[in-house]
């Protein structure tokens, strides 16, 4: 969803209302094209079939885990870190959906999955998928956690004022805090606020939407090496011979 801007006009319209509840409850002062909350709103407004037959909104990882455990739509869940990845629609410190925000977004509360702790056991591996995977049936399955949230643990960023620079699909700089910071949550800073995996952990992050994707674009469209994963090694070797400062060349993804 980093490059999916289908919600751009809706984001601009919603942002024009300057709802203070966004920053107060989520730490995010305004809507963003990347927020799943905006994609959910888009589906509610543009997909008649979904409005008629849809039961729950789910992220891909919880959806896979729910299927492995043989859960029904009524058992749909989301961990509290991934919940905060919605961007809007929840109370981040309480780890609960926000009735007021969801009403503004036009998303029915009953379509939201229940919020779990990342280490909660949501079920066990079903007989069907035990055969598919070659694993033993009955293995406990926990709710899991969001990718960036887990990256912060992997980097050791779990205490306020610690930070990490992450170069992935989306280039990110993250800094841990002890909660919502009014100064950092000002709209002009364009930062995103999330709950971490562990209890009472939070972080802000700034980003470039096409950080790592820009490398693939360069390989495919400039070097004409589409699909050649090994070509990145060749680019790395060539980059080693470039002097610091890249001779004044600046690339903006």
Spans of features found by a protein language model:
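Buried hydrophobic packing segments
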Residues: 36-43, 68, 151-155, 214-218
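ATP-dependent carbohydrate kinase catalytic cores
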Residues: 85-199, 210, 226-237
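Structural signal for hydrophobic packing residues in well-ordered secondary-structure cores
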Residues: 15-19, 44-51, 67-72, 105-109, ...
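Gly/Ser/Thr-rich active-site cleft segment
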Residues: 23-146, 253
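Alpha-helix/helix-capping structural signal
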Residues: 6, 38, 62-63, 170, ...
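Active-site phosphate-binding/coordination module
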Residues: 1-37
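Glycine/Thr-rich phosphate-binding loops that ligate phosphate moieties of nucleotide
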Residues: 1-16, 49, 71, 175-253
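A general structural signal for short secondary-structure junctions and capping/turn motifs
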Residues: 23, 32, 48-50, 54-56, ...
């Amino acid at each position: 969803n980093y490059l999916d801007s289908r919600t751009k006009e809706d984001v601009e319209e919603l942002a024009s209302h300057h709802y203070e509840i966004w920053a107060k409850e989520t730490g995010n002062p305004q809507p963003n094209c990347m927020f799943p909350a905006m994609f959910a709103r888009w589906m509610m407004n543009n997909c008649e079939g979904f409005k008629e037959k849809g039961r729950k909104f789910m992220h891909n990882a919880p959806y896979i885990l729910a299927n492995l455990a043989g859960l029904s739509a009524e058992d749909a869940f989301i961990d509290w870190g991934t919940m905060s990845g919605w961007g809007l629609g929840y109370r981040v410190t309480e780890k609960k959906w926000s009735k007021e925000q969801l009403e503004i977004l036009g998303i029915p509360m009953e379509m939201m999955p229940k919020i779990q702790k990342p280490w909660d056991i949501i079920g066990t591996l079903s007989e069907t998928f035990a055969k598919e995977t070659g694993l033993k049936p009955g293995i406990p399955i926990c709710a899991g956690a969001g990718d960036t949230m887990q990256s912060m643990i992997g980097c050791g960023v779990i205490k306020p004022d610690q930070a990490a620079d992450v170069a992935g699909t989306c280039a990110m700089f993250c800094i841990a805090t002890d909660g919502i910071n009014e100064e950092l949550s000002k709209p002009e800073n364009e930062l995103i606020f999330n709950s971490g995996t562990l209890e009472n952990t939070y972080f802000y992050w700034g980003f470039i939407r096409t950080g790592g994707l820009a490398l693939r674009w360069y390989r495919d469209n400039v070097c004409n090496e589409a699909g050649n994963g090994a070509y990145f090694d060749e680019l790395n070797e060539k980059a080693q011979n470039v002097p610091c400062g890249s001779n004044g060349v600046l690339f903006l993804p």
